[in-house]
Amino acid sequence: MMNHFLIREKFLNFFKKNNHTIVSSSSLIPNDSSVLLTTAGMQQFKPYYLGDLDPIADFGSKNTASIQKCFRTSDIDEVGDETHLTFFEMLGNFSFGGYFKKEAISLAYEFLTKELNLNIEYVTVFDPKKVDANDWRKNVPEDKESFEIWKSLGISEDKIKKEGVDNFWGPTGSEGPCGPTTEIYIKNKNNQNVEIWNIVFNEYFCDTGQNLTKLKTAGVDTGMGLERLLMICQNAPTIFETDLFDSILKILPQNLPLKVKRIIADHLKGSVFLISDGVRPSNKEAGYVLRKILRRVIVYEHLYNFNQDVFVNIIDQIIQIYGKIYSNLNSDKNIIFDEIFKEKEKFEKTLKIGIKELEKIKEINSSDAFYLYETFGLPYEIIKELGKEKAENLNYLDFQKELEKHKVVSRQGQEKKFGGHGLVLDTGELKAGSKEEIQKVIRLHTATHLLQQALREVLGEKVRQAGSDINAKRMRFDFAFDR
């Protein structure tokens, strides 16, 4: 069985042999201030796609490959099922005018079928006939070239599926590079088809009016999740039965629900990497993400009353698994422990008060649940578990409605107090020091709403705001999108 070390080695050696410069993973905290965390392998190469930097000068090649640390906040609430993670690693090869479709597809095919001996179940390519008539991508030509390349490699026509907008990637904002994609699917142990590799051909620039023009230099951007690939190569039923998770899950008490085990393993792993890359628990930006996942784990520890040594052993095991790949985890070990246990000590005081409040309530309704959540950080599932009979009539839909109602009330209160824009001087989201700056911030605040609406029109209703930071000079808008 191939372990994760061997797969990493095979991937990097394969692309090095095929004239790619191997580039180390960048930090989870990107240099790009427009995003909160690193979510894909291409992020550190964005300036090269845009022509702002020269890959020859920096890498000695127009082709690179990397294994990138990634963290996606959009999946936090889904962690615990068979497929979702917050922290993961992405294998990728990239080209900034060095090669295009034929080479990109051929390299992917060779690596999967020859190096890893895997069988491709089917692939997908872009076809505008599958796109709605009024969609801005309707006039993009069918990707016949990719279709023919796959055929030439021995993939039969019935296994080359033509898809619509799901096979067109980008732009990542209101404008930028974009293009058709081809995706590779392989069957897992459960006989399910798993998308294993996505190859994006950035050949267009899309402006804010959704007009497409050909890029001067076309680029290739590919991504393949290491955890998914391990699941396939190790014939595991889920991503959690691979050697990146097995030894961690075995440390946890056996009486814990499987979902809880997975959440704890994922969230502590994410915490270790975020702290090592400089994030500290706080109420803002990446620090808030770290605080949220850490506190969720702390609540489960309290709920199931397992020994604190379990925490220590899991963190040790995570560092042991990844320390040979990311040596800074070893040197940062004391910092990682200090930050996690400082946050643990701080939150446990609030948690105890919250549980006492819960015990005072005779019958917990959605309003009570929201109060416990908002004031003491008790998640819905913990309220249900601790409340037992007192919470038997509480359901998640009512709890969600209470959350939405609170958002509406908050917005109305802000509008009444601050002239309809919800602005205060330095709230942590919107920052202004004078009336003149307030007017500038108001305009940028309005722009975030317009941007979000535009994103939804282009990418779909799944776009969700994940945060923003606005001052008189600039704005940052973070959003989550399930692709």
Regions found by a protein language model. Give the residues of each.
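A glycine- and charged-residue-rich anion-binding loop/surface
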Residues: 1-483
